[in-house]
Amino acid sequence: MRSHYNTDLGISHVGQSVKLCGWVNSYRDHGGVIFIDLRDRSGIIQLVCDPNDSKEAHEIASNARNEFVLIAEGTIRPRGEGLVNPKLKTGEIEVVVSKLTIENESAVPPFAIADESVNEELRLKYRFLDLRNPKLYENFALRSKACIAARNSLANMGFLEVETPILTKATPEGARDYLVPSRVHQGEFYALPQSPQLFKQLLMCSGFDRYFQIAKCFRDEDLRADRQPEFTQIDVEMSFCEQKDVINVAETFLKDIFKACGKEIQTPFRQMQYKDAMENYGSDKPDLRFDLKFIDVIDIFAKSNNEIFANIAKDTKKNRIKAIRVPKGDTIFSKRQMQRFEEFVRKFGAQGLAFIQVKEDGLKGPLCKFFSEEDLNELSKRCELEVGDVVFFGAGAKKTVLDYMGRFRIFLANELNLIDPNALEFLWVVDFPMFEQNDDGSYSAMHHPFTMPKNIDETDLEEISSIAYDVVLNGVELGGGSIRIHKNDIQQKVFKLLNIDEEQQKEKFGFLLDALSFGAPPHGGIAIGLDRLIMLVTGANSIREVIAFPKTQRAQCLMTDAPSPASNEAMRELGIKLRENIK
């Protein structure tokens, strides 16, 4: 129907006849000559409807309004002197229209397509209009390139794309499952997969050797800016591999994805042990675009005359005292800013925020009186303090201190404008603990219970580490993976450590244990969150900007009004009866 997309055309096409299709982006009547900005998925081009060129086209144009669908035929000509629009790819040219068709009319739109101030709920209610925004289209064009690049890269490395089931069995993977009632087997339910984890392991047991899938996953969890109830991941599994092999594959396809998106990245990525990430940055996904690394000063505070700090410093296993040095911070921060810093950390469990300022005549601050001159000199040397610096201290329980100081580090970086928005800092975080303790004292798998432990015979669960790895970009976890357990006895032992008895093992994971009993190969893999990846590449503010039809923070689709009540007939067929007074 069309001869070109709008932005295929340029000054080299002057004099050429074209046929274009699209929507009215804007409409202007200048003294009898009508100018229409025609928008298609590629961008905008200006149509000129002059009655001297075509009375019929001009008359039709006079009836056009925003978001009407047009088909225009005409000739390319250069714009007049001083009329070039450098903001448009087609800003040097315009189309003199000889024939115009209104293919379809539009109701008055509830908002202007390019208006960035529109309430997000309104945008999501009319998502089909919102997606006409060229900026959003660019996000999905980039997403498509990324998917194609991932497929090509993995195929070139010998990986086979295999689809795994969407209707499957509920298995504990950390979040709540979405359940689907069975009509045929009433009273029984399928679960939508939180990931293809067990199926891809079974494919390795089947001898497929190298698998991948761009997989849809479902998790019924509370939403945040970077979470959705359904999301997409680049899922990879391989046999007869070690951690370094999986990392090499992941770096290869990530490099190819970024190249397809117009960005060059350097490999190999740097690596950091989990314990170092936590102790030095207060996060298992540290943002390395800036420094502000923690300094451990608990041994110096152990010698202080302050009873509170001295008591904290006695237990170096359970407690931490960390410092963050801000070069020239004493010359930058106002008294009000220093108060705001303390208010910030208190929101995350801090009892306060101690600090020392470096003046021309030495270290100053309420803390100084609790230290000897020798200890202050040691503190100054440890923190590499210079005149004009300020150093902040966090002290208390290990988990609390690392958390609030990690958050404070990012808060400081934003206050100081230390973060380069164009930088791409990749990092592998490796050697994760196998287990983590819950608030009730029980233990759960930090990644998942199918991860290979390094020292399974260790009696202290907190000392057992795993062959697990996360890839981080600019402080955001892109994805993670592990070498899997491929021996039945080790898998059963891990289940027992998680208080999953033999009956539960058989009920929930019997098929996996069976597969591990028939010569399962060593295997491992990784999953990269595609939505999150594209959000970072495009600079989008929310993951909703890179998903065509996303849910809200309340897990609702405002456009289709999902979820919605099922009919009484459908409920009867499924054998389901709701309790009364359910809202």
UniProtKB/Swiss-Prot annotation:
- List, in alphabetical order, the Gene Ontology terms for molecular function in this entry: aspartate-tRNA ligase activity; aspartate-tRNA(Asn) ligase activity; ATP binding; nucleic acid binding
What is catalyzed by this enzyme? tRNA(Asx) + L-aspartate + ATP = L-aspartyl-tRNA(Asx) + AMP + diphosphate
Instruction: Please describe what this protein does.
Output: Aspartyl-tRNA synthetase with relaxed tRNA specificity since it is able to aspartylate not only its cognate tRNA(Asp) but also tRNA(Asn). Reaction proceeds in two steps: L-aspartate is first activated by ATP to form Asp-AMP and then transferred to the acceptor end of tRNA(Asp/Asn).
Q: Which PANTHER family match?
A: ASPARTATE--TRNA LIGASE, MITOCHONDRIAL, ASPARTYL/LYSYL-TRNA SYNTHETASE
Pfam families linked: GAD, tRNA-synt_2, tRNA_anti-codon
Enzyme Commission designation = 6.1.1.23
* Residue ranges of the region described as Aspartate: 197-200
Where does it sit, as one GO cellular component term?
A: cytoplasm
Q: Where is this site: Important for tRNA non-discrimination?
A: 30, 82
Query: What general EC class does the enzyme of this chain belong to?
Result: ligase
Q: Name one GO biological process term.
A: aspartyl-tRNA aminoacylation
Q: Where does ATP bind?
A: 219-221, 228, 477, 529-532
**InterPro entries per the UniProt record, alphabetical:** Aa-tRNA-synt_II (IPR004364), aa-tRNA-synth_II (IPR006195), aa-tRNA-synth_II/BPL/LPL (IPR045864), Asp-tRNA-ligase_1 (IPR004524), Asp-tRNA-ligase_1_N (IPR047089), Asp/Asn-tRNA-synth_IIb (IPR002312), AspRS_core (IPR047090), GAD-like_sf (IPR004115)
Superkingdom is Bacteria
Which family is this protein grouped under?
Belongs to the class-II aminoacyl-tRNA synthetase family. Type 1 subfamily.
The answer, when asked if Transmembrane helix is one of the entry's keywords, is no
Where along the chain is L-aspartate bound? Answer: 173, 219, 447, 484
Its subunit composition reads: Homodimer.
Q: Where does it reside?
A: Cytoplasm
| NCBIfam families for the chain | aspS_bact (TIGR00459), PRK00476.1 (NF001750)
Keyword Lipid biosynthesis in the entry? The reply is no
Query: What are the entry keywords?
Result: Aminoacyl-tRNA synthetase, ATP-binding, Cytoplasm, Ligase, Nucleotide-binding, Protein biosynthesis
Please identify the protein, giving its name as recorded. Answer: Aspartate--tRNA(Asp/Asn) ligase
- Family annotation (Gene3D superfamilies): Bira Bifunctional Protein, Domain 2, GAD-like domain, Nucleic acid-binding proteins
